[in-house]
């Protein structure tokens, strides 16, 4: 069973919100920074409550993302594949909505998860592709790290709190340590992302005065308290 098939309904909702945040920024990929924004927007979860208590509500996370775009740490809004299709009279969002209306949201999510089964190549643990829109999934490593958290606690399902911990663990490493192969470097260059420096998630968290490790400890404490 893939990591994505273990997502609970709230975790699936986080994914939907994360893609919305990527689209808001006109980014042609889904990164851990977008997942962080999705977690902040899923307001009824323990993960969102922890983020709010650390000064990272939806407004603060969005402001952090916009600041990183202005600083060149994240890509500026650009004409992506969706824009190209729009210029040809094809509304990709409308196509996706029509698919969901025809087959049902649950069926679309299930198909998405089947396509995202764990591949064999090691570098493909870092990146995948959303089959519904063709965009890169740069947050894939964070998802696999999230999957290890319930395993260590004797649990199966992946909740928003596990996703948050996966995003934070992924942010511990500098960008260059996770993207060493030529293929992955080319992908980052194509997307307009820097190939070195701290993780955008780390930068957003530390901008609030909160340490990344301290926030991880808080999430772990919450997970153990609810186990």
Where are the regions a protein language model picked out?
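Histone-fold recognition with a strong bias for associated Lys/Arg-rich disordered tails
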Residues: 1-227
């Amino acid at each position: 069973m893939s990591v994505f098939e273990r997502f609970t309904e709230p975790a699936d909702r986080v994914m939907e919100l994360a893609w919305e945040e990527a689209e808001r920024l006109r980014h042609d990929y889904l990164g851990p920074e977008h997942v962080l924004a999705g977690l902040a927007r899923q307001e009824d979860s323990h993960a969102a409550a922890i983020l709010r208590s650390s000064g990272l509500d939806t407004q603060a996370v969005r402001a952090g993302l916009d600041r990183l775009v202005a600083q060149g740490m994240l890509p500026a809004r650009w004409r992506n594949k969706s824009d190209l299709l729009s210029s040809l009279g094809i509304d990709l969002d409308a196509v996706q909505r029509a698919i969901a209306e025809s087959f049902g949201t649950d069926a679309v999510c299930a198909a998405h998860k089947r396509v995202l089964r764990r591949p064999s190549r090691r570098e493909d643990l870092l990146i995948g592709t959303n089959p519904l829109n063709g965009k890169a999934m740069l947050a894939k490593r964070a998802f696999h790290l999230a999957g290890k958290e319930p395993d260590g606690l004797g649990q199966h399902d992946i909740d928003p709190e596990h996703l948050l911990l996966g995003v934070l663990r992924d942010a511990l490493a500098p960008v260059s340590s996770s993207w060493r192969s030529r293929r992955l470097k080319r992908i980052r260059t194509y997307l307009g992302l820097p190939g070195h420096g701290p993780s955008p998630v780390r930068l957003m968290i530390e901008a609030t005065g909160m340490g990344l490790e301290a926030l991880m400890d808080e999430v772990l404490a919450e997970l153990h308290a609810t186990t």
